[in-house]
Amino acid sequence: MSWPPHVGALRFAIGDRVECSVYDSWKPGTVVCLMYRETEWPVGQTAPYQIKLDDTESLIYAPMDRNECIRRGPQAAEKQRDATPVTNPLELMKQRNTAMHSAASVARGREFTPRPMDVFIVTYPKCGTTWMTQVCHQVRTTRYLKGLLRANGKTTAEINAAFARAGPPTSDTQKDTAWSMRFGEITEVVPWDILASDCGQDLDAAQCINSPVLGKCSLSPRLFKSHETVGNIAPGGKYVCVVRDPADVFKSFFEFLPPYMGIPSGVITPEEFCDAIFAGASHSGDVWGHFRGWWDMGVDDDCEQSSMLFKNASDGDRNVFITSFEDMKNDLPTVVRRVGAFMKTEDDSGDLSEHDVTSVCEMCDFKFMRRNSEKFDDHFVRREMWRRIQIPEHEWAGGGVGKVREGGGGDLPESVREKIDEKWAEVMKPRGFPSYQDFRAAIEARNVRWDQK
């Protein structure tokens, strides 16, 4: 069901008679709960219903006991048209967000043993997770093809020359039909660590793409999507972290999470959402702590601090690479080169060629990803997740949530901006970063040092 713009929630007294929607058809005198699990909801708990009154759709809240519904005329309901908006959608969003993965699946995602060359894309939500996942996937598939040629006796120079002659994919058809895109949705080939078990994926299994020409292709390195903090991530692999201006993160998260949890747009205010996130509503913690944790785990190379948990066996290697969403927008080729160098496995020969970098950038272009949005919309994991939180199946078809966005902080309320800035000063300033721009500058300085090694 597509929900109309929110025009103000209404509260109805017990016994009021209204017209209520049974999904697409209107049936007078009935109430339909959008989320009802009798064994899990205590007596007296409230939950949302969709109603129709004078051709206006909105949300109301009524007792969970469906036997107590609506037996009287609409007069009392009419009187309460201007009632104070209820805030229960926020609680429903938090409840659903908490229930989106099973405890067993979370434990499996955090406790399995990665291979040393496995790469986790460990971003805070809305920092460019899907975009960086596509970058890493395109890097590994590019290297896979070159590895096949190398196995047939071709030298690196011969391989690069052959790729250069072919040219990068430029037409829509070339890109849409590329063998690297032979998946339904990208989490099928890049499992989400703490949701993989719920989705029937084995984190120890090979990650493969089937090609009509090449057959079954087992890709290396294996890639995993994650929003986990340093303290919760499965240790022993390699970790790519993307940071982003917290104001932009907040705006994008605010526009994304409620509909992702089946909550209509507009029923939660930016201020309410901000308070909830600050209070720990996100499974991933807060963005500031996430940034600081991954920055501190990446300082082994600076000799500032180290952790045996994340230290690679090779002293000359590193296993945490950090970049920014803004740098991906401003200079994607440089980010691709750095990702390629970071992801290099023992079987790889040489860095990515300029042709390789151009090809990867073509396949990670926003226009291309938007045109193929169904491959990047989480529908593979969302089907299972929505079953768990009991969002009605009839809503799935219209419930796609776009994940390819350029984003921007936009017109956030001043009170929200102040809270975001205050939190930065509390968490990041003591670490030596008075502002987000200072943090980005430090990340770039670190990456330049690695470029020169």
Predicted regions and their residues:
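Mixed-charge, Lys/Arg-rich low-complexity intrinsically disordered regions
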Residues: M1-V18
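Intrinsically disordered, low-complexity, charged/polar segments
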Residues: W3, D54-R81
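Short, well-ordered loop/turn sites that connect or cap secondary structure elements
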Residues: R11-F12, W26, F342
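Short beta-strand-centered aromatic/proline hotspots
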Residues: K27-Y36
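Short aromatic-glycine-enriched beta-strand elements
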Residues: E40-Q50
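PAPS-dependent sulfotransferases, especially Golgi type II membrane carbohydrate sulfotransferases
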Residues: R81-D118, T123-P125, N210-S211, K216-L219, ...
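The conserved 3'-phosphoadenosine-5'-phosphosulfate
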Residues: Y144-C208, L223, D315-G410, A445-V448
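Conserved phosphate-donor/acceptor-positioning beta-strand/loop module used by diverse small-molecule
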Residues: K238-F253
